[in-house]
Amino acid sequence: LPDGEALQDEEVTLLQGVLGPAFQRGKLGDVGLQTIGQMVTDQKVALGRVVKGHKVGLTSKAMRERTGATEPDYGTIFDNWFVDEGSQVSMSTLNTPLVEIELSFVLGADLGGPTVNAVDVIRATEFILPPVEVVDSRFSKRGLPGVVDSICDAASCGFIIVGGNPVAPGDIDIRHVGGALYKNGVIEESGTAAAVMGNPINSVAWLARKLHEFGVHMEAGHTILSGSFIRAHPIA
């Protein structure tokens, strides 16, 4: 929860309803995870934050194997997480920062429902931008969080640096978009967008269907992070 914010009585009751049965079962389950994530979102919005999009993570086989996840994770993106290209970010504000490269879909129309497919994503997308995502867990423990922690924590989103040069989805073969991560002038890793569920369009469609299960949909103007096509690398 945001620093200094206490849970309201109704939120405590809601958490009890989620965590009590989860303790008995030994697992939270999707509904419990989404409930906690939505409570955090509601707290942030109450403090003046604005929902600016959603993200899906662990979309590559390499990242799922690294974290032990069986499916992608997901979370909400807020306005204060966007950083201008070329800006400096203080490391003192970060906990366990990692960096990823991926594609973001900026929507020109609402997107949601149980049957969203690749065609729906293409029709709803106004343009695509290349972002760098700084992944950062708000949990005190070091290393990559588990999928339970991650979903409760907005899929471990820290900051987003969105590049320029917007491209319409029909102007490129998205699967073949490549990227390389440099650190101090040395390539750490490179990859192509096809590593993201075969095509990042598929990950956005998956996310739209997943969010629909909890009554959430993507809105026109939202930025959707489709998932990294390389492993997450430490900044330091």
Q: What residues fall within each predicted segment?
A:
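Catalytic-core "active-site belt" of small-molecule-metabolizing enzymes
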Residues: 1-4, 15-22, 26-199
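Low-complexity, glycine/proline/serine-enriched flexible coil segments
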Residues: 10-13
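Residue-level recognition of short, solvent-exposed, well-ordered loop/turn junctions
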Residues: 35, 219, 235-236
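Buried hydrophobic packing segments
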Residues: 40, 162, 204-211
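Short glycine/threonine-rich loop-to-helix capping motif typified by GTGT followed
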Residues: 66-69, 230-236
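Extended mid-to-C-terminal alpha-helical interaction segments
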Residues: 211-215, 219
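Conserved metal-binding segment of the jelly-roll/cupin
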Residues: 218-231
